[in-house]
Amino acid sequence: DIETFSVLGENGVDAPGQKADIVAERITFSMKEGRLYSHFFTDGKEEFLLQMPGIFNVSNALAAILVARHFKIAQDVVKDALQRQTVPGRCENVRISDKFVFLVDYAHNEMSLRNLLGTLRGFDPGRLVVIFGCGGNRSKLRRGRMGETAGRLADFTILTSDNPRWEDPELILDDIESGIKGTSGAYIRIADRRAAVAYAF
């Protein structure tokens, strides 16, 4: 059998004439004590809370719920597991302060960075600061596009080194900067990653 899931409102409504086996409804996002949360209901009444923000994480949770149902895992066990579950490096909340949120995410291309920053904008942050770099010996086109995305969607961007491999880190930053320069976004270059993170605080 094939079972399906849907995030109501993700594409307006479910496909005409079709009804998903499980639908996330009344989806809300919140911030509490330096963490971001996703909150939703299924079957009109079952309530779920995730420590991972964003529609894409709600979709992932629905897939997990369906698999758990297939194996007849108790709903309370599923709820508890989803509420506690995090994925290292994927919208990972790092608790530092109650006054701001610090997330680590493996956004390695323009699309993933755009989705991430768009999701974070949905939380209506007072200020959105992004620290990122691009890996060496990989597509150079990606670098400028990521710089442009950060410049458009973040309030402030800190460009830094990220595994330069055999390339000069400063030349990689030049490529990223070529994209961000065409936006109105404020930014700074700090090649040393540890210093870049320290600067953000």
Question: Where do the protein language model's features map onto the residues?
Answer:
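Extended acidic/charged loop-beta regions that coordinate divalent cations
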Residues: D1-E47, Q85-V94
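Short, active-site-adjacent cap segments at secondary-structure transitions
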Residues: D1, N137-R138, W166, A196
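C-terminal helical cap/extension that packs against the catalytic core
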Residues: V13-P16, G147-A200
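Generic structural signal for helix capping and beta-alpha/helix-loop junctions
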Residues: G12, Q85, R138, W166-E167
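Short, ordered loop/turn segments at secondary-structure junctions
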Residues: V7, G135, S161-P164
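Hydrophobic anchor at the start of a short beta-strand
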Residues: D1-F5, L128, Y187
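Nucleotide phosphate-binding/pyrophosphate-handling subdomain across enzymes
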Residues: K32, G44-F156, S178
